[in-house]
Amino acid sequence: MAPAVLKTVADVKDWTAGLRREGHRLALVPTMGFLHEGHLSLIREGRRRADVVAVSIFVNPTQFGPKEDLSRYPRDFEGDVAKCISAGAQAIFAPAGPEVMYPQGYQTYVEVTDVSQGLCGARRPGHFRGVATVVTKLLTLFRPEVALFGEKDYQQLQVIRALNQDLHLGADIVGMPTVREPDGLAMSSRNAYLSPEERQRALALSRGLKAAQALLREGTRESEPLVAAVRRELEAAGLREDYVELVDAERLTPLASVAPGQPARLLVAAFSGTTRLIDNMQLGGEENAGRV
């Protein structure tokens, strides 16, 4: 059965009101479209956790900087609908235009402070304000019991967890493991920008993280050699580093080392050609160095 396609705020309110009357549990998967297997894994997990899954497809203009790729961000709505059907989504919210979410005179924005300050937040001013605003609007509009996000955008996930808690939005925020291509490249809609050569060089991000993981398993816990392992792979592949940082997994504050049992995260951002890519992995904590 084809999913309901919701175009306006009124459409969403009418549709969710029907769910509430019938007592259904709702899972929401917010996306910017051009869906890949990572997104579909969120939809399938949503089916396991709720009765009904809604997917939002909205290229959110407020999270793009003036020199970023808003106009060329990849789009394929018909393909996205087919993928949503295959994964079991029952509704798609695809605003008819940006004015649905940001009508004329719009002036309210949400800003999460601490966890948005470093990493991507320091290099993309205003990005997380845009993310926090649109996700707050979606959670308020849909009022889902569950909302699912990928761990590939790890800082974004922590921003969303913070706003959900601080604003008492009541959703269960679920972070799902990064889905990777067979050669280790983290799936991303922006991978479509990469030439074959750039894509091959982009494998340095996951190779570097695996090298750091191996060092940790051998007993190296200091930040400097773990970060250096990633940087060596980036340099060898000719990638331009944006950042490589070891941080506390919850607060995202820099760490000098990984203490036994302490959840930490190693995050990397780099350019392959003109395309900025990000990746990360867990170090320490219950999973004992995580998985790449």
Swiss-Prot record:
ATP binds at residues 32-39, 150-153, 179, 187-190. Its EC number is 6.3.2.1. The active site is at residue 39. Coiled coil: none annotated. It holds the Pfam family Pantoate_ligase. Gene3D superfamilies: HUPs (3.40.50.620), Pantoate-beta-alanine ligase, C-terminal domain (3.30.1300.10). Beta-alanine binds at residue 63. GO terms for cellular component: cytosol. One of its GO terms (biological process) is pantothenate biosynthetic process. Pathway: Cofactor biosynthesis; (R)-pantothenate biosynthesis; (R)-pantothenate from (R)-pantoate and beta-alanine: step 1/1. (R)-pantoate binds at residues 63, 156. GO terms for molecular function: ATP binding; pantoate-beta-alanine ligase activity. It catalyses: (R)-pantoate + beta-alanine + ATP = (R)-pantothenate + AMP + diphosphate + H(+). It is found in: Cytoplasm. Keywords: ATP-binding, Cytoplasm, Ligase, Nucleotide-binding, Pantothenate biosynthesis. Homodimer. HAMAP family: PanC. The reaction proceeds by a bi uni uni bi ping pong mechanism. Catalyzes the condensation of pantoate with beta-alanine in an ATP-dependent reaction via a pantoyl-adenylate intermediate. Belongs to the pantothenate synthetase family. This is Pantothenate synthetase. It comes from Myxococcus xanthus (strain DK1622).
